[in-house]
């Protein structure tokens, strides 16, 4: 990498990335603390790689995309090459988990950006929302950075589009149909479960009453079910799912 007098080599870039990975689990209030001379604060892994000044120099000048070739309408185009590379690496050896989860993750960010979100009542309230497909032990297979409302978005609900994108990844990278998807009530709906059933994909998740196609109307209200003994449940089915009930109310 050479720009404005900044010169580096692949080995140094790998060390730079290593320091960033280190900061993911060894958290400090400021980057300079990793180079502290205090034995209970400084991180020897960072100190042995490069100086703090060199780390900040590379960080200031590092670019992941050519500014002359940015994709119009892609709010994350400056990091798109990186997360496409990550997605490719995640599935390099296939998809080896049977149970898969789709959920959101938040990357903390307090600066100004068109894709930055404010999420009230969340542990991390400001940052980028990322949809992630993971195995049951947390291993990530695919991620989609949410870029807020799309101008020409299709009429299909966002939650369904996210799940469908993840299913496409599963079908492209896995040779088995034994996978089961787990997700929360942001994604789940009767129509989504029908779509997944047609794609031979098993799924389970919580659901909001108004998305259950009337199932909530024939089942006990939450307040009444809570009065039952521990472990009490209800179920109803549309008759089209032979293995398990369509809805279970616990």
Where is each model-derived feature located?
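Acidic, contiguous segments within the catalytic cores of piggyBac-derived transposases
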Residues: 1-250
């Amino acid at each position: 990498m050479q720009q404005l007098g900044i010169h580096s080599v692949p080995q140094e870039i790998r060390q730079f990335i290593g320091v960033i990975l280190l900061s993911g689990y060894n958290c400090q209030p400021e980057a300079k603390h990793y180079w502290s001379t205090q034995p209970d604060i400084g991180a020897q892994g960072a100190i042995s790689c490069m100086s703090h000044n060199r780390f900040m120099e590379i960080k200031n000048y590092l670019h992941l995309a050519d500014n002359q070739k940015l994709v119009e309408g892609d709010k994350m185009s400056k990091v798109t090459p990186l997360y496409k590379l990550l997605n490719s690496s995640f599935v390099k050896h296939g998809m080896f988990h049977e149970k898969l989860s789709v959920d959101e993750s938040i990357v903390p960010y307090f600066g100004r950006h068109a894709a930055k979100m404010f999420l009230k009542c969340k542990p991390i309230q400001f940052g980028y929302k990322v949809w992630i497909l993971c195995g049951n032990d947390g291993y990530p297979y695919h991620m989609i950075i949410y870029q807020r409302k799309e101008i020409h978005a299709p009429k299909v609900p966002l939650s369904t589009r996210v799940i469908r994108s993840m299913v496409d990844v599963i079908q492209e990278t896995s040779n088995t149909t034994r996978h089961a998807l787990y997700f929360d009530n942001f994604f789940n709906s009767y129509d989504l479960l029908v779509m997944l059933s047609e794609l031979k994909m098993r799924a389970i998740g919580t659901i909001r009453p108004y998305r259950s196609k009337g199932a909530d109307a024939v089942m006990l209200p939450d307040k009444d079910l809570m009065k039952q003994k521990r472990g009490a449940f209800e179920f109803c089915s549309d008759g089209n799912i032979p293995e398990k009930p369509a809805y279970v109310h616990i």
